[in-house]
């Protein structure tokens, strides 16, 4: 096969992957956008030609300005070594200003909240299409309860399958979504040819006319429904690392054309002869021939499942990045698939399932879900715009240029936020409340880390080198282990956390041949795996600094094995011959890892607010995974110790001896 043929093969494969991974959310929008718009106006009987021209024009220009220009053309350039998404962007610009962590946390929390609502609204809307199938109505009737049960069954099965990975079935996502977009385009085009005049909506004049028209019953609030057409744009940016910007940019024109054909086709059908339908209908299913409705429902359900899968996988990635950026507590993470970056977080998975299921039961219908959908994601988009401004300034774009560009998009997004704010009382409070809860967890965790760092001052290993050497040779002290490893969250040269030396010398003197001090630094690059080592001119003290990307698994034990071999190969660490071993020629001694847990003492000198933050952080920590599991030490020798979180600031309590 020639190089050109190989390139074309890989390019086609990349485009198919992009279809299956990136466009699930935005690709299911035609299921409910036009329905939400006409429902807000009062139903089919309340719309006319001017209204539909304005509505489709708003959809077209929203997709063009926000999805195409902001995300596809601009945001995809703000990649962190190929990775996208709000936390990858934050990792890229966080050194510019401390306050940038606030929009990152708000945006990330809102995106996670959106991840719970998307499966509910997309799957429910798809299944509700069964009402247009006569055979289904004859068998089960038109009861919404049956729709809810089917929806809950599909959602539950989807979340149950997450623990097994999506390697095999994931290969089908691309072809299925390619077929879905083609179906959208063809079905829309068939109806569009009945009334080409709807193409006048390409003129933004009609969009403006609708916004100011007295015939528009909801005024600017119509933008809350229009915005649903572009909610998947943020997911598009978040999935950059899975497919690459080139594949997204090459596949987006086809996807956009198919989406627009569906929207324009639905509008043409609504304005067509004989469509004076009373009440609320879904034009997406209603415009199809009756013989295709069942096939369309199956196709739409598959697309909704794929869209939900993308949001679930994206939520796993988002939380994983937040953990490594120390914005979220450590959660148990497994890697069921062979693909790079594929992960499974049980707490996130079942938490999403619980919230999604409750949303389906609470809202009952897709119409009510649509009324609540989109509010949270407008916040994420606005926060992403804020971080893009910092990125553009970092790239030396002049202040005026960066301000005008991001200010333009921020203005649009603020307008959409105001329009979507009306959704708060119609169910939007659920998404906002969930986002607020996630944000508070992030804020408490981040602030708690800051407080501990501010109050715990490091100590120099060189200053205590003589004591450590003496302890090493002191035969009156029982040997703790050949190699003892301390994981320290803070290390600068020979400076380590005070609690580490306190553990070795004060709490329980630990005699060992070699003392290891290991620190993990999370880099802004996603897949870094490097280390530095310093023996401090001794044969018994070793400081190791691991530099791991924010998407790299922190499997400390396995990394340490590699480092030990490297040190022995270069003569910096003496061989530790073993008398007893089932491994022939083993020259590495036994290891024990010491993990030091921190507790808050009653006497700590903290303000009430800081104390509340620390207490809340420690409470949250109880539900997080253990450090041993997080650092891959489940099968290693591990000792767990407890020290006061701020033990160097606890004053002695006065007490007087009673005279006899």
Swiss-Prot record:
The chain crosses the membrane at residues 14-34, 56-76, 99-119, 139-159, 173-193, 208-228, 257-277, 286-306, 343-363, 372-392, 399-419, 424-444. Keywords: Cell membrane, Ion transport, Membrane, Potassium, Potassium transport, Symport, Transmembrane, Transmembrane helix, Transport. Pfam families: K_trans (PF02705), K_trans_C (PF22776). It is a multi-pass membrane protein. It is found in: Cell membrane. It catalyses: K(+)(in) + H(+)(in) = K(+)(out) + H(+)(out). Coiled coil: none annotated. Transport of potassium into the cell. Likely operates as a K(+):H(+) symporter. Belongs to the HAK/KUP transporter (TC 2.A.72) family. HAMAP family: Kup (MF_01522). This is Probable potassium transport system protein Kup 1. It comes from Lactiplantibacillus plantarum (strain ATCC BAA-793 / NCIMB 8826 / WCFS1). The gene is kup1.
